[in-house]
Curated annotation (Swiss-Prot):
Residues 19-147, 191-320 form the EamA domain. The chain crosses the membrane at residues 9-29, 38-58, 64-84, 99-119, 135-155, 182-202, 212-232, 249-269, 284-304, 306-326. Keywords: Membrane, Repeat, Transmembrane, Transmembrane helix. The keyword Repeat applies. It is found in: Membrane. Residues 350-374 are annotated as: Disordered. It comes from the Eukaryota. This is WAT1-related protein At2g39510. InterPro entries: EamA_dom, WAT1-related.
Length: 374
């Protein structure tokens, strides 16, 4: 029971380590001149190749019928995160740093909460103190993001970082750092990411097969992001060149870990914990990226950005505190979802159903679960 309780926490923490690793690898690849649009395209081509065989063989007996409504939802999912968010995210990272990008993505839980509230995936009662904490925390989180962008402050000396490398990224890529532009792109990307997470939760209610949904998202996302990359990089075929270097590593790592496994795992967790829980551990990624970025990429830290990141984390955990007060009700809901599975097991041994074959029994058992998920 203890392991079952902690499994979602361990899983999302592991995801944050995966995301942190990609931030460092992707920034290194971008510093080497890789196009952010080509990276988004290659990432989801790799993800499709990786996840599709698992989805085909493991879901072929349980995959629901594809409807036009579900297809359009998946088409939108492929547009929101693999295409729009990834293009904006990597472009914003090119204008800033890996640490700044990781810190800015802490606004994601706030945006996810607002959208979950709008789509009634999150319980909010403005008269209750825990709901007020969610709303206040969201406002504080956005304020912290603005503080990071506007206030720079003095340089924080780190023994392993070289302050003379502050403009290193700009000289390597030919792109001058622009915090305002970079922060704006990342923030818009986070809005799309939050929309993706909430829409994924909605889609799973009518198409409750996480592997197949992930495969479809990656496949359609790879097509859409490739179209965008071909348009932006037209007349520049060298942008698509890739060798055994950091560019290939970024595409493979991002495709397998962050898209293939990441989309699937967050889909499994949000079916019981909700979309806000999935995004709640982003500050851990920020801490990991800040440490690794200063060591590997020689990134420097400024007081204003650290203060802004602290404000973001305080706001985030105000949201999480309010979210924690909803856990008893969601746990009760989870128990209700498990009840139909036990009911057929009591009915099946009765005389009326003694002659029922195993195929019919499986139908009786699975049907309540499907209805419940819908």
């Amino acid at each position: 029971m203890a392991l079952k309780t902690w499994k979602p926490f361990i899983t999302v923490v592991s995801l944050q380590f995966g995301y942190a690793g990609l931030s460092i690898i992707a920034k290194f690849a971008l510093n080497q001149g890789m196009s952010p649009h080509v990276l988004a395209s290659y990432r989801h081509i790799v993800a499709t190749i990786f996840i599709a065989p698992f989805a085909y063989f493991l879901d072929r007996k349980i995959r629901p019928k594809m409807t036009l409504s579900i297809f359009f939802k998946i088409l939108l999912l492929g547009l929101l995160e693999p295409t729009i968010d990834q293009n904006l995210y990597y472009t914003g990272m090119k204008y800033t740093s890996a640490t700044f990008t990781a810190a800015m993505t802490n606004v994601l839980p706030a945006f996810a909460f607002i959208m979950a509230w709008i789509f009634r995936l999150e319980k909010v009662n403005v008269k209750k103190i825990h709901s007020q904490a969610k709303i206040l925390g969201t406002i504080v989180t956005v304020g912290g993001a603005m503080l990071m962008t506007v206030v720079k402050g003095p340089l924080i000396p780190l023994p392993w970082a070289n302050p003379h490398d502050i403009h290193q990224d700009s000289s390597n890529t030919g792109v001058k750092q622009d915090l305002t532009k970079g922060a704006s792109l990342i923030a818009i990307g986070c809005i799309c990411w939050a929309g993706f997470i909430n829409l994924q939760a909605i889609t799973l209610k009518s198409y409750p097969v996480e592997l197949s949904l992930t495969a479809y998202i990656c496949f359609l996302g790879s097509i859409e992001s490739t179209i965008v990359a071909l348009f932006i990089e037209r007349g520049n075929p060298s942008a698509w060149a890739i060798h055994l270097d950091s560019k290939l590593l970024a595409a493979v790592y991002g495709g397998v870990i962050c898209s293939g496994i990441g989309y699937y795992v967050q889909g499994v967790i949000m079916k019981t914990r909700g979309p806000v829980f999935v995004t709640a551990f982003n500050p851990l990624s920020m801490v990991i990226v800040a440490i690794l970025g200063s060591i590997i990429l020689a990134e420097v830290m400024f007081l204003g950005r650290i203060l802004g990141a602290i404000v973001i984390v305080l706001g985030l955990y105000s949201v999480l505190w309010g979210k924690s007060k909803d856990e008893p009700s969601s746990s009760f809901s989870d128990m209700d979802k498990e009840l139909p599975l036990s009911t057929p097991q009591i009915v099946l041994p009765s005389k009326a159903n003694a002659k029922m074959d195993t195929n019919d029994a499986s139908v009786v058992i699975s049907r309540p679960n499907t209805n419940e998920s819908v």
